[in-house]
A protein has these predicted regions:
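Conserved mixed alpha/beta catalytic, RNA-binding, or beta-rich assembly cores of soluble enzyme
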Residues: 75-88, 112-116
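Long, charge-dense
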Residues: 117-135
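A common structural junction motif
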Residues: 47-50, 157-162, 189-194
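Short amphipathic alpha-helix segments
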Residues: 141-158
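Terminal, non-globular segments
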Residues: 174, 180-183
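Glycine- and acidic-rich phosphate- and metal-coordinating loops
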Residues: 92-102
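C-terminal regulatory domains involved in ligand/effector binding and gene-expression control
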Residues: 1-77, 163, 181
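Short glycine-/aliphatic-rich beta-strand segments at the starts of folded cytosolic domains
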Residues: 129-144, 172-174
Length: 194
């Protein structure tokens, strides 16, 4: 289980032309299905005159939520090659949309696969890939007299303090790399028995 994942920093674009058909590709960093739906709606409105608006997305640090859509192209000739480019770069939290303007010459199954793959590759090559840290939050409630001990653990393990409330009973919420969360919880819970 990794503490990081790869995604892109900002929107990027690419273009691929084959036998007068033009393939416009756009890659977006995304976090939710709703965000993806909104972007797809926008693209379908903006490029209403395009023959096809095909896409693929990958969501989540574990890369388990994904979809590929051919939007009327022959089965597996558009969405799958786009998704293949996302997979080959091991990216997640990403949407890649490829819009096709038909140029009058049929490309055939293999031609479509190559065109959608290359258009997606162009957009992804133009993107800045970044590494994000996967964090878990830990909330700990303790009496004020334990403050020094708690802060010593915080200093040693260096979690990010998300929220803190200090009174007779204190509450602190910490964010830490996923792999370190069990150790942080264990160290804080041990303090209660000192």
């Amino acid at each position: 289980m990794s503490d990081t994942y790869l995604t892109i920093q900002d929107k990027s674009e690419g273009i691929y032309t084959e036998k007068r058909s033009k393939f416009l590709a756009f890659a977006h960093p995304v976090e939710t299905i709703d965000e993806i739906k909104d972007l797809l709606t926008d693209y379908k409105k903006k490029y209403y005159d395009a023959r096809h608006v095909c896409y693929a997305y990958m969501l989540g640090p574990e890369r388990t939520d994904f979809r590929a859509n051919d939007d009327g192209e022959p089965s597996s000739t558009a969405g799958k090659p786009i998704l293949g480019q996302i997979n080959s770069r091991e990216l997640t939290n990403i949407l890649v949309v490829v819009i096709r303007y038909f140029g009058g010459v049929k490309l055939g199954t293999s031609g479509l696969i190559v065109a959608y793959r290359e258009a997606a590759a162009e957009a992804l090559s133009a993107a800045t890939v970044i590494e994000r840290t996967i964090e878990e939050t830990v909330t700990f409630t303790f009496p004020y007299v334990m403050m020094n001990s708690v802060m010593r653990v915080v200093k040693e393990l260096t979690p990010r303090i998300v929220e803190q409330k200090y009174d007779e009973t204190c509450i602190i919420t910490l964010a830490i790399k996923r792999s370190m969360a069990p150790m942080l919880e264990e160290r804080l819970n041990k303090l209660a028995f000192e």
